[in-house]
Amino acid sequence: MNQSRSRSDGGSEETLPQDHNHHENERRWQQERLHREEAYYQFINELNDEDYRLMRDHNLLGTPGEITSEELQQRLDGVKEQLASQPDLRDGTNYRDSEVPRESSHEDSLLEWLNTFRRTGNATRSGQNGNQTWRAVSRTNPNNGEFRFSLEIHVNHENRGFEIHGEDYTDIPLSDSNRDHTANRQQRSTSPVARRTRSQTSVNFNGSSSNIPRTRLASRGQNPAEGSFSTLGRLRNGIGGAAGIPRANASRTNFSSHTNQSGGSELRQREGQRFGAAHVWENGARSNVTVRNTNQRLEPIRLRSTSNSRSRSPIQRQSGTVYHNSQRESRPVQQTTRRSVRRRGRTRVFLEQDRERERRGTAYTPFSNSRLVSRITVEEGEESSRSSTAVRRHPTITLDLQVRRIRPGENRDRDSIANRTRSRVGLAENTVTIESNSGGFRRTISRLERSGIRTYVSTITVPLRRISENELVEPSSVALRSILRQIMTGFGELSSLMEADSESELQRNGQHLPDMHSELSNLGTDNNRSQHREGSSQDRQAQGDSTEMHGENETTQPHTRNSDSRGGRQLRNPNNLVETGTLPILRLAHFFLLNESDDDDRIRGLTKEQIDNLSTRHYEHNSIDSELGKICSVCISDYVTGNKLRQLPCMHEFHIHCIDRWLSENCTCPICRQPVLGSNIANNG
């Protein structure tokens, strides 16, 4: 008994030093963490505003107590060295980078490039390569957090160093695009926007290569300033492109982007101008990338979906079938639709007065919220008397992309009432607009004919949210495929309307209007039925997307109609559409994600510019500050003299790095929950 008791006493004596050592180590660790926290706050307090924003915008601040001041200094020095090698990204000065390596790996992504401009705020970058010159400008408005990206691209028509000679490329099928992409890899531009695409671009004065498929450059020896604006010739019979996508086998692309709307409107008034525009909306601001497309020769392609029962997969609508407009040259068509179209989903059909051509370049729809606009303009005209040779004005294919976050509450009508059919018909001369709203997606298609120029507009409004700065959306993501599906659905509707017009023009006995109306009715019913299957509520969004993705990857045999001129549909994987650049404009969708849950009312964070506009001060240990409070409610730490604080409009104060991180995901005060910028501003932010 005594021996066992002595052994137990000895064991307890052994555990006492171990417990003491454990507590000592824990106390030492806590003390070191406190020292690191103090050094952290001291480092933040000593940073000037520019260095603080630089580290914050690059997510280099870390967590207090887990990172040392030495590591913070190393991070700051590292990012400064990185920006020193590219001063244009910081101070907005012009930077000629004609000697940038062609295979620069860190500039091969349009997403990465645009992200760089978005992080750095105001910046201007320009460069030249051969006959290519480009200039990219990014601007931020600190008052409202608007971001605008503008890419200006021009081509020197006399310098054809990168142009492909010959006309054989017009016979390459669309399915050979990947092979064509590989064969021409070495001929790409050095612009970071042009990397990872099948595009071969030539640019001149203040331009840049862009992520756009190739189309043939119509160069007939024009001078550099006027080469893109041919005023001679007439429209070639036919239109190139497949459901709003330029064919991969067309040769070259002419680009022109205009930083302001007035400049863009002025250029659109020039006769024979070939233009397209891609507008990126972020935080309620529009950025634009305008693309001018001049085609030398294109095979006639009909932009139409050939199946009677439209597939749920809009990818089936991208391959082109034959589209003829030879009869249009001698007899312009003036059609009106007076009959209501009733279909599932909320649908309205109405006619409106012709609009000025200048308005078509931006928001040519009767709706005020943001939109994705795919516009295909067909120009017709006789040969100019000033032309000594038969130079034709070729079809103009214009793709407009406008994306903006839809404010909470705009899509609350996703109930049974919103899915009922409501039609309306008005009177006008030559404009037809169809609107459908189902499952939160609003799509419109319009047709306008004015002075021999016919414009088809397909508009898609998609509920979006901006993804985090460091998050990259995989091409196989459900959200990106949802956006892709909606875009292709709109392209299919657009092409169906165009073919309806084409077929109606073939009938000169006065029965073309019923045929067109029949096409529009079938279009609305079939597409709306597929949209209804996609899910009319966000609760089924993920399941619907998964089902539709499975359908997108399946190769189905299309149902051909009576016309022998309608070719079969060629299905392609949506991943390849994004990766190979068949739809390069979809890379811009990487900035956005579809709302995959019913959280339209969820309030999101403030922009960096809105956060920076809030007042700051240094904490001082005096009677006034003692009355206001000594503890940051975010990190639950006491204020120390010299701490940099940010004050909200409600007069609550926090550590600047603590509240900035909070406001990046929220727009209310952590204490009183009052909106920091007001409900309207916060929602728009």
From Swiss-Prot:
Region span, Disordered: 1-29, 81-107, 121-142, 168-273, 286-345, 499-576
Pfam family, one: zf-RING_2
Positions of RING-type zinc fingers: 632-673
The organism of origin for this protein: Homo sapiens (Human)
Record gene name: RNF6
PANTHER family in UniProt: E3 UBIQUITIN-PROTEIN LIGASE RNF6, SI:CH211-59O9.10
One cellular component term from this protein's GO annotations in UniProt: nuclear membrane
Protein's cellular compartments: Nucleus; Cytoplasm; Cell projection, Axon; Nucleus, PML body
Pathway in which this enzyme or protein is active: Protein modification; protein ubiquitination
Disease entry from the Swiss-Prot or TrEMBL record: Esophageal cancer: A malignancy of the esophagus. The most common types are esophageal squamous cell carcinoma and adenocarcinoma. Cancer of the esophagus remains a devastating disease because it is usually not detected until it has progressed to an advanced incurable stage.
EC numbers, comma separated: 2.3.2.27
Reactions performed catalytically: S-ubiquitinyl-[E2 ubiquitin-conjugating enzyme]-L-cysteine + [acceptor protein]-L-lysine = [E2 ubiquitin-conjugating enzyme]-L-cysteine + N(6)-ubiquitinyl-[acceptor protein]-L-lysine
Family per record: Belongs to the RNF12 family.
One of the GO biological process terms: protein K48-linked ubiquitination
Function (record text): E3 ubiquitin-protein ligase mediating 'Lys-48'-linked polyubiquitination of LIMK1 and its subsequent targeting to the proteasome for degradation. Negatively regulates axonal outgrowth through regulation of the LIMK1 turnover. Mediates 'Lys-6' and 'Lys-27'-linked polyubiquitination of AR/androgen receptor thereby modulating its transcriptional activity. May also bind DNA and function as a transcriptional regulator. Mediates polyubiquitination of QKI in macrophages, leading to its degradation.
InterPro entries noted in UniProt: RING_finger_E3_ligase (IPR051834), Znf_RING (IPR001841), Znf_RING/FYVE/PHD (IPR013083)
Gene3D superfamilies: Zinc/RING finger domain, C3HC4 (zinc finger)
Protein name: E3 ubiquitin-protein ligase RNF6
Comp. bias regions, Basic and acidic residues: 1-10, 17-29, 88-107
